Amino acid sequence: MMDVNSSGRPDLYGHLRSLILPEVGRGLQDLSPDGGAHPVVSSWMPHLLSGFLEVTASPAPTWDAPPDNVSGCGEQINYGRVEKVVIGSILTLITLLTIAGNCLVVISVCFVKKLRQPSNYLIVSLALADLSVAVAVMPFVSVTDLIGGKWIFGHFFCNVFIAMDVMCCTASIMTLCVISIDRYLGITRPLTYPVRQNGKCMAKMILSVWLLSASITLPPLFGWAQNVNDDKVCLISQDFGYTIYSTAVAFYIPMSVMLFMYYQIYKAARKSAAKHKFPGFPRVQPESVISLNGVVKLQKEVEECANLSRLLKHERKNISIFKREQKAATTLGIIVGAFTVCWLPFFLLSTARPFICGTSCSCIPLWVERTCLWLGYANSLINPFIYAFFNRDLRTTYRSLLQCQYRNINRKLSAAGMHEALKLAERPERSEFVLQNSDHCGKKGHDT
């Protein structure tokens, strides 16, 4: 029967030694001519075999189950001084730019009258969520990363930090999802959707986004799935059920909705492009009506001039709709693309981690986790600049605020809007046609 050591585990080394040493001794006696072992061999052979068995039996601790805090839990990286300066500068720059960009959005919409419309309330909600990430989350992650990954802010604040991180990031993602739905309805239902697009409706949508984001935050605080938190680690709960629920609600469902909305807008833009080819209008020819009665001829030409005016208005409307659809498709495509590139690696890692490492800790290399996390945070940085790039009013307001030109911002926006409307009203290739036919109609009207 195998011996058991003081820890209650089988004494593998002692068992092997008791079996092998007597057999080796008898073998040596058989090899000796006089039936006895050589004195030198008898003296060193047991020690040699003992050393061999100690080496070969040294993996015996594999009988022990690995502790819960091994395989990456509490992993730390010791950065040099230069590395700390470089990493700290990059993380600080990301944080400050995120704060500045989202503050510009909030100030622009709240203080510029033309921008205070219900459709922009969603952009303000997005900016507030991204601003919360920059103020309440990024600084603590930056400090933790600079000291090598060790959590130093205590057990209580770990739960508060995770709650803020999850809620703000989820609110940002879900607001992007609602914005995509808003853009889709604005394009596909231009006549009916603006009626429902009022302040109360937008307020309810924004409130729903934040409540749903909070629903992901609350379970670990009320005992469903405890966060991983000790002296070194502050990690969101790795419970299988909670991981699937939180990642699905916070990312996979919103991403699916955004992709579907983008596809629908893209399809509408292509359909509009095929429909509105604008082949041109027939010219008004004085000789087109031949009649012996001059009154009938004049009446026909007046009707053609009236038809020309209606056709011009219809073409301008079609051009406006077409350009709006194309702009919405381009904007939403860039938003969805940036969102996917920033957040997809992090959520794939978060979903797979419990199944790879178990529920007690993380075995993923720290640098991989932090890279994916900061890539997701970068989405909060680029959102304000994406909207400013495609929104002329926001772009003009940004420029005025950065140049400290606070007066007459609304007047500048109105003038820029009128200039853009006049610019898009008539395409250059139709200007000659419009002038020729307008002169002809004006001449006929003067002759009457």
Curated annotation (Swiss-Prot):
Keywords: Cell membrane, Disulfide bond, G-protein coupled receptor, Glycoprotein, Lipoprotein, Membrane, Palmitate, Receptor, Transducer, Transmembrane, Transmembrane helix. GO terms for biological process: adenylate cyclase-activating serotonin receptor signaling pathway; behavioral response to pain; chemical synaptic transmission; circadian rhythm; detection of mechanical stimulus involved in sensory perception of pain; dopaminergic neuron differentiation; G protein-coupled receptor signaling pathway, coupled to cyclic nucleotide second messenger; long-term synaptic potentiation. Its main location: membrane. PROSITE patterns: G_PROTEIN_RECEP_F1_1, G_PROTEIN_RECEP_F1_2. Glycans are attached at residues 5, 69. Belongs to the G-protein coupled receptor 1 family. This is 5-hydroxytryptamine receptor 7. It comes from Rattus norvegicus. The lineage of its organism: Eukaryota, Metazoa, Chordata, Craniata, Vertebrata.
